[in-house]
UniProtKB/Swiss-Prot annotation:
Its cofactor is pyridoxal 5'-phosphate. One of its GO terms (molecular function) is ornithine decarboxylase activity. It comes from Bos taurus. This is Ornithine decarboxylase. The modification N6-(pyridoxal phosphate)lysine is found at K69. Signal peptide: none annotated. It is an enzyme of class 4 (lyase).
Amino acid sequence: MNSFSNEEFDCHFLDEGFTAKDILDQKINEVSYSDDKDAFYVADLGDILKKHLRWLKALPRVTPFYAVKCNDSRTIVKTLAAIGTGFDCASKTEIQLVQSLGVPPERIIYANPCKQVSQIKYAANNGVQMMTFDSEVELMKVARAHPKAKLVLRIATDDSKAVCRLSVKFGATLKTSRLLLERAKELDIDVIGVSFHVGSGCTDPETFVQAISDARCVFDMGAEVGFNMYLLDIGGGFPGSEDVKLKFEEITSVINPALDKYFPSDSGVRIIAEPGRYYVASAFTLAVNIIAKKLVLKEQTGSDDEEESTDRTFMYYVNDGVYGSFNCILYDHAHVKPLLQKRPKPDEKYYSSSIWGPTCDGLDRIVERCNLPEMHVGDWMLFENMGAYTVAAASTFNGFQRPTIYYVMSGPTWQLMQQIRTQDFPPGVEEPDVGPLPVSCAWESGMKRHSAACASTRINV
């Protein structure tokens, strides 16, 4: 395998016949001979490209603006910038990151309805004009700090069927929307469109239909007030892995007819979205090492459900936890499932087990209960679908460092990226033949891992 670090990408370029699985196994073998068996990620950039092609096919009218907050790793942002996505930034720092990679301000939306004045001024000074708002106070701030801004009115949605609800904090009602549009007109601030977010982990695609219908109402209000609105932002909430009840294409099959009904292609309205986890969740797999182990009595398991515990119960402590990558358990309603790096014997007995992080906090529990064969200090566990809302919010609490990320890319992936960069595929094109691209996509048929039966099973998306 050749490891390249050039001006644009710092990753392992896979020789023909090698996969992301090989990189993971190679890294485990390398560190197994050292004392520092630190946790690490393998991130497959081919998986991200595959998601992009899938997006173009499923939502041909919708331009993706990647939600940087989801995973702000520089290599990820570089990759998405190279293939032409826009960017949803929530702060000055995210804008700086994106623009440092040469992304023009026209490909950025400052999608935070509540912004610090100094950061509004920063956006103004650096050419970022598109930004969201949902209150009169925000209008007044923008009028003073960035009078040439192109504002997008964030409306509230029914997010009652989402895992992570957002409308409790953001979004104007339809009644308030008219008042805000009238106030914006008085302030001579240009409102160019409407945005919404149905919530992360949306389980009912009809929520998108209602939100798109509501956006149409606000467009009509804007026309009555005197605005020529031309941008619709349908937000995020798209799944990033396949282990979900509602698949990506099930959602898009509902969105597309709604867009055609309320914003037909000849309406002149540009449509964007803010996918985050969709692009990165399945690209990342985390490898953690068991640093300690305890055999405990039933009443000492730390489980909230003692009835299913057995007399022989194990507690395993690993070198990443909820203050690190697994913060998604606390903040993103995630449920994670460990996979075993070593193949268990066919007749191996399984025991009730729990998995804990390395910090001194009793809150640092990753999996409350699962069935595992007896593991040992130095053994490895793998966690798939760990690319979204993990590394971005990880801390160094107790002095534990964030895991290193090893990026991989196959030759066909690199070639296709160059083709996209030079030809700038427009939305709606037929998906190019990626040939052997899937060999570099993490955790497909080439990587069948051994799954533990756990009470906590999946990451919500």
